[in-house]
Amino acid sequence: MLIQLCLTLFFLGCSIAGTPAPGPEDVLMGIVGGHSAPQGKWPWQVSLRIYRYYWAFWVHNCGGSIIHPQWVLTAAHCIRERDADPSVFRIRVGEAYLYGGKELLSVSRVIIHPDFVHAGLGSDVALLQLAVSVQSFPNVKPVKLPSESLEVTKKDVCWVTGWGAVSTHRSLPPPYRLQQVQVKIIDNSLCEEMYHNATRHRNRGQKLILKDMLCAGNQGQDSCYGDSGGPLVCNVTGSWTLVGVVSWGYGCALRDFPGVYARVQSFLPWITQQMQRFS
């Protein structure tokens, strides 16, 4: 099911990038303007699954990133319910192809950021604790978290990955291989200006791009439906660093509408606190 989410805060008609898929054959899974990722290139990428009784199948719902052998960071809007039952989720790790292969991993704990209400209001992050450690799994490796002082700019080499739709109206075709695309970081003030100019009177006087958000994308290259919760990584001093979590945007890869991400840097204290508390 492809859900066009209208953010009531600013009446945009903007879309959440990751939503439950309709079924294993028609699943809205690709990155707009990207290409297939080699096996093992992005070893922290995971697929967050929910069970569809109609098909008796665990379908792709969102992306996520392994940040510790037993912890996954994703978007809060992928979880939806603050008291979500961990047993309704499964995690797929270490595979470029969405279906087939390894067994799915169980989730033992779900933690949504306490300030989350809606993706457009910020705090769009959640943690999933895995029932088992993936320390010894092949093609699996945690991604590096940013330092509190890290500043990423348009000069940095950044990529976003996922199994989301390859255009606003076209799902990723079989064999459902992980997609990757290089995107440009866009300064928050410029991103704010772009959204305001493109939507004009619909958001007059309302701040759209908050401090805990990050913008990235190019016309024709972006994350899309089914990518939510997935990683935006930048090559910082030779190491891939997780700087963003796919959150929301207006359509996919449209001119003047960059993708909007949860800024991982803003949530470092919360992430560290939760992992220490429950590990």
Curated annotation (Swiss-Prot):
Q: Where is the Peptidase S1 domain?
A: 31-276
Q: Which CDD domains match?
A: Tryp_SPc
Q: Where is the signal peptide?
A: 1-17
The catalytic site is made up of H77 (charge relay system), D124 (charge relay system), S228 (charge relay system)
Instruction: Provide the free-text tissue specificity comment from this protein's UniProt record.
Output: Expressed in embryos and placenta. Found in uterus especially in glandular epithelium during zona lysis and implantation.
Query: Which GO terms fall under molecular function for this chain's record?
Result: serine-type endopeptidase activity; serine-type peptidase activity
Q: What induces it?
A: Up-regulated in uterine endometrial glands following the initiation of embryo implantation. By progesterone.
Q: Where in the cell is it found?
A: Secreted
One GO process term, biological-process aspect: proteolysis
Q: Where are the annotated glycans?
A: N197, N235
Question: Which controlled-vocabulary keywords does the entry list?
Answer: Disulfide bond, Glycoprotein, Hydrolase, Protease, Secreted, Serine protease, Signal
Pfam families recorded = Trypsin
Q: Any idea of its EC number?
A: 3.4.21.-
Q: List the disulfide bonds.
A: C62-C78, C158-C234, C191-C215, C224-C252
Which family is it part of?
Answer: Belongs to the peptidase S1 family.
Q: How does it assemble?
A: Homooligomer, heterodimer and heterotetramer. Able to form homo- and hetero- tetrameric structures. Heterotetramer is far more stable than the homotetramer.
> What protein name applies here?
Serine protease 29
The encoding gene: Prss29
